Amino acid sequence: MNKQALLFYPLLGVVLLGLFVGGLAYGAVPIPLDHVMDILLGKGSDKIAWQNIVLQSRLPQAITALLAGASLATSGLLLQTLFRNPLAGPSILGISDGANLGVAAIMLYFGGTLGRFTDWPISGYMAVILAAFVGACVILGLIIYFSAKVKNNVMLLIIGIMIGYLASSVISILNYYSSTDRVHAFVMWGLGNFSGVSLEQLPFFGTCALIGLLLAILLIKPLNALLLGEMYAANLGIQIKRTRIVILLCTGILTATTTAFCGPISFVGLAVPHIARLMLGSSNHKILVPVTMLTGSCVALLCNMLMVVPGNNTILPLNAVTPMLGAPVIIYVIVNRKNIQYFN
């Protein structure tokens, strides 16, 4: 294993822990770190309000940010390797737009429930997660199909963008014919946040995210084989079609779960894999996958803290913060593309 990677594991672990605990203390209501630690250790606090803020609000929010960041970053890495394209990602290729369309159909047209169409009523966040998953997987399936037809990566990106425009067009029509309350709910969901997962919903969200992340870890060997090209991967015994389907499923789980609960989050899935590659100087997925997960969690936790305006109760939308960190990385990657190791 790369010796440099061995240094990044503990370093990222310390940064992750610091951002996690810092996020519990920092907010519209500042809470001293010693009180935060007492609350986490079960000792409680003489201020009940602080205890409720930490346990009921900030702790689920921090765990959500940790898992969502890892999920989006891993999803972006899988797509970049699958398409051998450094600009591939859930948002760029229209996958997030597919999830948005599914959620829009549920929230704007069906009113957040599928119960009237099924014997088993599915309502609330269950309907949203199902709709996001189906929407994301449909778009992913289309991208995989077109990737077999179009060999030029730039053309494939354009197709993904066009699919995103089509999804946005349908969403606009649904918005036009929906009630004000439903449109407002959808717009608020679309701003992105990590506070949409309650303590009761956290086990479901965490289980879905961890399943996707575990599946990504199991894909490390096939991903490394794909770096050599599909022909060489097939000669190494990798079943290309099955590997594509598994990557499709894994990316669908990670993207749909995060998008359903947190809204469409930009740049994390696109930028974080590049940050990990720049740190490691390697595209070996044995070290790249875990470092990407850790880096994604750190970036998401940092964004979660930056959303809070100091000295003010205002909370910025998540998608107003992520481009500040992600856009400079992508610009740097484009400018220095020839000097960065991608798929070798």
How would you describe each model-predicted region?
Residues 1-344:
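Alpha-helical transmembrane segments in inner-membrane proteins
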